[in-house]
């Protein structure tokens, strides 16, 4: 059996285009990497189209700016957005599979969900309001379990 050799791309915090992901997949395939952990959600952005929940991409895929992690209080003022349609996600999965790489999609829950809470307030227990996170770290707000 082949060894488990994986790479992870965190598109939740920083969106990467489909062509860029394909280039990365090509590079990792050349190194016999066989698993791709595709980190699709994070407090800072929801990156996968879910047709039943369109606000996840209409609201959750966009943040107004980013507080720079190395400077704590400095804001870059640069909006960040982007998500993958279901067709694009299928395209990436097939592209990787053609190179013997298995894609493992990752969706955080119940924590790291400010993107979803900003999109659907009814998912929270505390009433909000919420916005897609502009800083990095750990937040207390999680999905309501009941």
Predicted regions and their residues:
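Feature activates predominantly on carbohydrate-active enzymes
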Residues: 1-140, 146
């Amino acid at each position: 059996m082949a060894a488990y050799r994986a790479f992870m791309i965190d598109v939740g915090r920083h969106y990467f285009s489909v062509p860029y992901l394909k280039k990365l997949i090509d590079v990792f395939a050349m190194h016999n990497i066989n698993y791709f952990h595709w980190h699709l959600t994070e407090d800072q952005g929801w990156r996968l189209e879910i047709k039943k929940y369109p606000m996840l991409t209409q609201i959750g895929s966009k943040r107004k700016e980013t507080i720079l992690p190395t400077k704590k209080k400095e804001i870059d003022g640069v909006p960040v957005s982007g998500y993958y349609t279901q067709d694009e996600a299928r395209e990436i999965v097939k592209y990787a599979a053609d190179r013997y790489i298995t894609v493992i999609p990752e969706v955080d829950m119940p924590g790291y969900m400010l993107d979803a809470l900003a999109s659907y307030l009814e998912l929270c227990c505390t009433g909000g309001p919420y916005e897609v996170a502009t800083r990095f770290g750990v937040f207390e707000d999680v999905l309501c379990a009941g």
